[in-house]
Regions:
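Glycine-rich beta-strand-turn "strand-cap" elements at beta-sheet edges
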Residues: 42-49, 74-118, 158-167, 194-229
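N-terminal/domain-start segments enriched in small and hydrophobic, helix-friendly residues
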Residues: 7, 11-13, 20-26, 45, ...
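Short structured motifs
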Residues: 37-38, 107-109, 141, 155-156
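An amphipathic, aromatic/His-enriched active-site/gating alpha helix that lines ligand/cofactor pockets
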Residues: 24-38, 56-91, 146-155, 174-210
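Surface-exposed interaction/gating patches
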Residues: 111-149
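Extended intrinsically disordered, low-complexity coil regions enriched in Ser, Thr, Gly, Ala
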Residues: 16-20, 32, 134-140, 149-152
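Short, well-ordered beta-strand segments in beta-rich or mixed alpha/beta enzyme
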Residues: 2-9, 38-68, 120-127, 156-187
Length: 229
């Protein structure tokens, strides 16, 4: 798999228009591109101008195909003056779960007229010391297995690694609601992971985007299943 982790800051007063344009790109991508499995759009709960995408593709070629689509061009043209500052983009490989997990967001028969956007999602970059990357990955994979297999409220606990900078990892966590995330923070597996990796970060962790799913709605497929690797 290839994943694009993208973070934006949007100019004041333009977030709603940006999100409407982004939803058009998301629908076009997941609905029409065979190599695009997810195009998740997240809005931070505390700062609505902070918005993130998690885009999942079959491979690098599928990303290149996406970039040439009319819906992508329409989104880019519509939003180019709405973005405040540089866009953070990281092209990644999946570390956890593996390719056999459930990646496809599509679900037949979803009626978006009855949609809800009540999930709680974390979109976080983790800078890791170069000599601790492998150890960090092993530790966070154990947390991922515990989260997705032992917590009914954890739908995804994905770990990604930037393909051009192996020290840059990403977490993409999806919970059924904020209460499920609070439960996650009390579990033994996250306590063990936090203690294990506490000294393995390379400087300060950038502020994560934590908030709701703007698109797709809750009724789509968000779960990775119960992956063990």
């Amino acid at each position: 798999m290839r994943i694009l982790m993208v973070q934006f800051t949007i100019k004041d007063g333009m977030a709603d228009a940006f999100l409407e344009a982004a939803k058009g790109d998301g629908r076009g991508s997941v609905g029409n591109e065979a190599g695009c499995y997810r195009f998740d759009i997240i809005q931070d709960r505390d700062d609505p101008n902070r918005i993130a995408f998690t885009e999942v593709y079959d491979d690098d070629a599928a990303i290149e195909t996406h970039g040439a689509q009319a819906h992508m061009t329409a989104w880019r043209d519509a939003t180019k003056d709405m973005i405040d500052g540089p866009v953070k983009v990281s092209r990644c490989r999946n570390i956890f779960p593996g390719d056999l997990a459930s990646w496809n967001a599509r679900r037949d028969g979803v009626n978006e007229g009855f949609s809800s956007e009540s999930l709680f999602i974390i979109h976080a970059e983790l800078p890791v010391l170069a000599d601790k990357v492998d150890d960090f990955i092993e530790a966070v994979k154990l947390d991922g297995v515990g989260s997705t297999n032992l917590e009914p409220g954890c739908l995804r606990f994905d770990v990604y690694q930037d393909t051009s900078d192996s020290t840059k990892l990403w977490l993409y966590e999806v919970y059924v609601n904020s209460e499920a995330f609070q439960f996650h923070t009390t579990t033994p597996h996250i306590a063990k992971w936090r203690d294990t990796v506490a000294d393995w970060y390379d400087g300060e962790r950038p502020a994560a985007i934590r908030g709701k799913n703007v698109w797709p709605s809750d009724q789509w497929n968000w779960s990775s299943g119960s992956p063990l690797n």
